[in-house]
Amino acid sequence: MSPKVTKEHKDKRQAEILEAAKTVFKRKGFELTTMKDVVEESGFSRGGVYLYFSSTEEMFRRIIETGLDEGLRKLDKSAEHQSVWASISSYLDELTEGLRDVADTLAPVQFEYLVTAWRNEERRQYLEKRYDLFVERFSRLLQKGIDQGEFQPVQPLATIAKFFLNMNDGIIQNALYFDEEKADVSGLAESAKLYLKTVLQADEK
């Protein structure tokens, strides 16, 4: 009888494999990364990797899901200790700082994955679900601001959430494609704040 593997061990092994996958994705991009690459990077056996993940797509989706969930949970947690507006404003400030070395992040790989989704219906549907999840979660955060008397929005919350996501992605794309001056990440982040402050009629008191 084989020894029982604990959940903690499984979680740890999966996390180690995903870290190896991130390294390869950043080095080679999504399309060119193979399972063999991840196996070699991880140092585990082929069977040891396939036990947890059947493809690089499954790995990348797990990475996307974890990143999105962590980001939204961080926003929610921040809003427990300060106003919703302050939490969103702080997020945009952190985004500006985090994009100084954007080429060394997974952002380029995520855009590569997104660009090819229109040709793959299953992938498009998957991304649509993630999009809907973000809109639902961010709208819920905005509703909390309304309930606390911070906001009096002049557009539907879902529309504001969708536009916020578009602004967020646009800022990241600028940082990827252009030099620091032309990308104007800090200026765009301030413009995003101005839009949100106006459309939400935010009370910063």
Swiss-Prot record:
Q: What GO biological process terms does the UniProt entry carry, in alphabetical order?
A: regulation of DNA-templated transcription
* HTH tetR-type domain segment(s): 11-71
InterPro entries according to UniProt: Homeodomain-like_sf (IPR009057), HTH_TetR (IPR001647), Tet_transcr_reg_TetR-rel_C_sf (IPR036271), YfiR_C (IPR041612)
Work out whether the entry's keyword set contains Repeat: no
| UniProt entry tagged with the keyword Cell membrane | no
SUPFAM superfamilies in UniProt: Homeodomain-like, Tetracyclin repressor-like, C-terminal domain
Q: Which residues bind DNA?
A: 34-53
List, in alphabetical order, the Gene Ontology terms for molecular function in this entry: DNA-binding transcription factor activity; transcription cis-regulatory region binding
Q: Which UniProt keywords apply?
A: DNA-binding, Repressor, Transcription, Transcription regulation
Name of the protein in question: Uncharacterized HTH-type transcriptional regulator YfiR
The UniProt gene name for this protein comes to yfiR
